[in-house]
Structure formats: C-alpha cells, structure tokens
C-alpha cells in the first residue's frame, strides 16, 4: 500500500537515516546518528532534559538541523504534538492491556452481562491517563484513577464521567486498588 503511493521500502538504516528529512518519534540512538547526513533535518522528540551535551555536540558536528517536536507550539501556544502522542499512547495502552489479558488469563477487558467487569487502575490524570480512562470505560471496564494533582483529577472528573472514582495518591488506598486490579 505504501509503495503503491510512491514510498520506497528498505531495511537499510543508512538509507532511512541518510535522507534530507528524518521524522522519528524516539530520539535517534548514537548508532542511528552516524547515518544522518550533513544539513539534514531531524524532527523527533529529542528529550533534551534526558540527554547530555555530547549528544547535541554530535548533532551539531554533523550540522543536523534538529527540531524537538515536544516544543512545537500551535497557534494557541499549546504543545499539540505532545498531546496527540499522549492521546494515542493512552488509547493504545488499554488496547494492549486487553490483548495481554486475553492471551495470559483468557479474560476480556470489557464488561459482559453477568460477569464482574475488569478492574483498571490508571496512575496519572494527564492526557495519557485521560485517554486510557476513556478507552477502558469504552470497553466496559471498571476504572479508578489516581494522581497527586487535584486540578488534573477535577479536570478528568469533568471531562469523563463523574462516576469514575478518582483519588489523590494515598498509599493505603492505592495499595488496595492495586491488589484488586486486573490492569494497571
């Protein structure tokens, strides 16, 4: 399908990273950087706060124009690419958990008439947590969300459904929820 649309398919890292423009979700590894050509454009989550100076010196030495997409703002000064990735990650995490439940325990994530719903504990009420919550509820799971931010919990409570239990992270409450959870 991609090749029919004009894309070239290759297994060669040198070919992939040797282009004028490289788009990559994760930052390139040291090995992958070797293949970047001078003056190429790299658009990636560079995770600047997790990298040392040498990483960026190497990019500079190769004269790579690196754009950290985690800092690209839209016209409303929102980090919309990061939000989008969080939305995708939240939804996919629940779909993946559903698949693992089915393969390992023979359980379904969704609610089935007469069967106790699967219990899902979500740690974090940010964008990823919001979309994980939406996906889990959509599949019929019983969901509980924990976060240390009261404002994030309020926001989630308003956006999702006031019937979804939310809680500040209290060690005793969290431990009880984790012991009962089918998915975390």
Predicted regions and their residues:
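Short, well-ordered secondary-structure micro-motifs within conserved domains or adaptor modules
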Residues: 17-27
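General beta-strand structural signal in soluble alpha/beta enzymes
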Residues: 9-11, 24, 44, 66-69, ...
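Glycine/serine-rich phosphate-binding loop and adjoining beta1-alpha1 elements at the start
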Residues: 30-119
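A short, aliphatic-rich alpha-helical micro-motif
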Residues: 14-17, 36, 175-182
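N-terminal beta-loop-helix "entrance" segment that forms/cooperates
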Residues: 1-8
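Short, well-ordered alpha-helix to beta-strand connector turns
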Residues: 6, 19-20, 39-40, 63, ...
